[in-house]
UniProtKB/Swiss-Prot annotation:
GO molecular-function terms, A-Z: fatty-acyl-CoA binding
Signal peptide range in chain numbering: none
Gene Ontology terms: biological process: fatty acid metabolic process
PANTHER family: ACYL-COA-BINDING DOMAIN-CONTAINING PROTEIN 2, ACYL-COA-BINDING PROTEIN, ACBP
Annotated gene: ACBP2
Record keywords: Cytoplasm, Lipid-binding
Protein's UniProt keywords contain Cytoplasm: yes
Induction: Down-regulated by cold stress, wounding and infection with the rice blast fungus Magnaporthe oryzae.
Domain ACB stretches: 3-88
Pfam families in the cross-refs: ACBP
Name of the featured protein: Acyl-CoA-binding domain-containing protein 2
Native source species: Oryza sativa subsp. japonica (Rice)
Function: Binds medium- and long-chain acyl-CoA esters with high affinity. Can interact in vitro with linolenoyl-CoA. Binds palmitoyl-CoA and linoleoyl-CoA in vitro. Binds phosphatidic acid (PA) and phosphatidylcholine (PC) in vitro. May play a role in the biosynthesis of phospholipids.
Main location: cytoplasm
Length: 91
């Protein structure tokens, strides 16, 4: 299985993560996903009154230097970690 296919598989698995994962982890996954699928952020930072989009933009900007392949690999690693943690907490 190639990196792209594995990334797509884990993007689907990420949808099954419990709601209890931290906002920090959710934002990290968002940033890595956007970097992997779109590339570097090209839009301006949302205004102060649009906090949700501002946090998401910041998360994407934080991983700006990564290649798409690096972002995919980091995304897969993080989803695996979160799935293992979720599995351990329900055992």
């Amino acid at each position: 299985m190639g990196l792209q296919e594995e990334f797509e598989e884990f993007a689907e698995k990420a949808k099954t993560l419990p709601d209890t994962i931290s906002n920090e982890d959710k934002l990290l996954l968002y940033g890595l996903y956007k970097q992997a699928t779109v590339g570097p952020v090209t839009t301006g930072r949302p205004g102060i009154f649009n906090l949700k989009d501002r946090y998401k933009w910041d998360a994407w900007k934080a991983v700006e230097g990564k290649s798409k392949e690096e972002a995919m690999a980091d995304y897969i690693t993080k989803v695996k970690q979160l799935l293992e943690e979720a599995s351990a907490s329900t055992s």
